[in-house]
């Protein structure tokens, strides 16, 4: 079942998504998140995680980095985003040490 769902998402990515401008507020995109969630967590949990992500992807949310977590959850992966932001701040400090 998981492979069939991934096949449908890949079809969307290839044939439907290019017809519209990019609107996803997250990285990875919602469709890529769905494929990764299906691959990592199976058909049922992966579908639920992907649908929860799509529902979070709306204009009133700031978006950002939101990778698929290693454990099942319907919430945003805030730990990964915080680690990414901290790494980017350290990188910025190293590039501009006199700020």
Curated annotation (Swiss-Prot):
Its main location: membrane. It is a peripheral membrane protein. InterPro entries: Membr_insert_effic_factor_YidD. One of its GO terms (cellular component) is plasma membrane. Keywords: Cell membrane, Membrane. The keyword Methyltransferase does not apply. It comes from the Bacteria. It is found in: Cell membrane. Could be involved in insertion of integral membrane proteins into the membrane. Belongs to the UPF0161 family. This is Putative membrane protein insertion efficiency factor. It comes from Levilactobacillus brevis (strain ATCC 367 / BCRC 12310 / CIP 105137 / JCM 1170 / LMG 11437 / NCIMB 947 / NCTC 947).
